[in-house]
Every structure is written in structure tokens, then in C-alpha cells.
Amino acid sequence: MLVIPAIDLIGGEVVRLEKGDFARKTVYARDPAEKAAELVRDGASLIHVVDLDGAKAGWPVNLDAVRAICAVPGAEVELGGGLRSLPDIEKVLELGVRYVVLGTAAVERLDLVRQACARFPGRVRSGIDARNGEVKIAGWLEGTGLGAAEVARRVKEAGVGLVEYTDVGRDGMFTGVDAEGAARLQAEAGVQVVASGGVAGLDDVRACRAAGLAGVIVGKALYEGRIALAEAVRAAAE
């Protein structure tokens, strides 16, 4: 199972939001590439990068920071946030991004997901963000009335092989990851699932591994020193 550290970007800086609230932001690093290099040294084989400005705007914003992260030796990058057109997807893949994570597009533009999967096979993932069971889009700012399993089934049919599921209500709150919900989603939709949101310690990593998930994304717990990446990588491999 993969442990995937997260780098969230606003204004070219590494930040974390509390419950996805843009008004509750903490800046953790001014240099994203330096942070990425540190994560690679600690054992990261994949880094989850989110362009939060892009998620809000609807197109990629932090391209300079993304380019710098991709240039770090040993850094394999997946990028989400504002990827809602084929030219934008192509642009970030050309920067060196390995996988794109489509969130809003997975709900509003299933045709785009299909086209992207056909054009860039194996490089398109879907981010499904839910609060109280309802899928949220546009940087978690808009509700959809849809459930996570329904969206996961749709993107699987469109060609997506892996879904990253975030419980928005837990994100940045250290309340424990929803490994059970992620495993249920994996079983119901028949697609590989990576869990995200609420990771508080190594027990969450072990819970995700025990649930048979493809991976777990670790963000704030890493930046607040509640979890060491090297230890988490070891726990995932136990």
C-alpha cells in the first residue's frame, strides 16, 4: 500500500486548510520544491499535489510551483485542482506530472474524463470529495446531491482505474481516516481507492492497509509532526 504525502498550494506556497475552508489556512513552507525533496528523502514514491487556487478558479494557477516540484529528482507527482479541459490536462502532463486527478470534471464533465482516459491511458485518476455522504466539487464549495459510490461507478465506466476519496468533514481535523467508508466504496464501485482526510497517526495507515486500500494520503498530520513519513511508509509495508 502506498503512503502518499500531500502538498497543497495557494499562491505558490505549501498550505493546509481546515475542513477545506479557504479562510482557515496555515502556511507550512514557502518553497514547494524544497518540501518535495524532503518528502522524497523520507521515502515518498508519489506526491499528491493540489492546486487549491486552481480548484477555485477552474484552471491551473500554480504552474511554476508544479514545474519546480516535478523537477525534483525522484519525485513522481499526481496533480489535482482546476483540471477541467483537455488542453490544461495536456499542459500539466507536459510539465512532468505523472497522474492527473479530476474532481469537478468527474461530476460535471464525464465526457472530458472519457476523452482524457482515452488520450492518456493509465494517467487519469478521479478525486471524490464528500461531506456527510454528498459529493462536493469546485474546491469543496458546491454540493452535487450525488453519493460517492454513484460517482465512482461513473468514472470507472469512463476508464478511471483509481479513485481518491476524501471525507471533507475529517480533513485536517485528526479525527481518524474513514478507512471503512473507503473500503466500502472500493467494494461497491469495483475500483481501487486511496483514502484521504483525518489521518492522525500510524494507526490510520495500518487501518487503511488492513482494509485492503490502494493507499492513503497524509497531509496535516505530517506537517504538524504527528506522523513521520518514513515510519508511515514502513507501517504500510508491514
Curated annotation (Swiss-Prot):
<dbReference type="InterPro" id="IPR023016">
    <property type="entry name" value="Isoase_HisA-like_bact"/>
</dbReference>
<keyword id="KW-0368">Histidine biosynthesis</keyword>
<protein>
    <recommendedName>
        <fullName>1-(5-phosphoribosyl)-5-[(5-phosphoribosylamino)methylideneamino] imidazole-4-carboxamide isomerase</fullName>
        <ecNumber>5.3.1.16</ecNumber>
    </recommendedName>
</protein>
<keyword id="KW-0413">Isomerase</keyword>
<comment type="pathway">
    <text>Amino-acid biosynthesis; L-histidine biosynthesis; L-histidine from 5-phospho-alpha-D-ribose 1-diphosphate: step 4/9.</text>
</comment>
<dbReference type="GO" id="GO:0000105">
    <property type="term" value="P:L-histidine biosynthetic process"/>
</dbReference>
<keyword id="KW-0028">Amino-acid biosynthesis</keyword>
<dbReference type="InterPro" id="IPR013785">
    <property type="entry name" value="Aldolase_TIM"/>
</dbReference>
<dbReference type="InterPro" id="IPR044524">
    <property type="entry name" value="Isoase_HisA-like"/>
</dbReference>
<keyword id="KW-0963">Cytoplasm</keyword>
<dbReference type="GO" id="GO:0005737">
    <property type="term" value="C:cytoplasm"/>
</dbReference>
<dbReference type="InterPro" id="IPR006062">
    <property type="entry name" value="His_biosynth"/>
</dbReference>
<dbReference type="Pfam" id="PF00977">
    <property type="entry name" value="His_biosynth"/>
</dbReference>
<feature type="active site" description="Proton donor">
    <location>
        <position position="129"/>
    </location>
</feature>
<feature type="active site" description="Proton acceptor">
    <location>
        <position position="8"/>
    </location>
</feature>
<comment type="similarity">
    <text>Belongs to the HisA/HisF family.</text>
</comment>
<dbReference type="InterPro" id="IPR011060">
    <property type="entry name" value="RibuloseP-bd_barrel"/>
</dbReference>
<dbReference type="GO" id="GO:0000162">
    <property type="term" value="P:L-tryptophan biosynthetic process"/>
</dbReference>
<dbReference type="InterPro" id="IPR006063">
    <property type="entry name" value="HisA_bact_arch"/>
</dbReference>
<dbReference type="GO" id="GO:0003949">
    <property type="term" value="F:1-(5-phosphoribosyl)-5-[(5-phosphoribosylamino)methylideneamino]imidazole-4-carboxamide isomerase activity"/>
</dbReference>
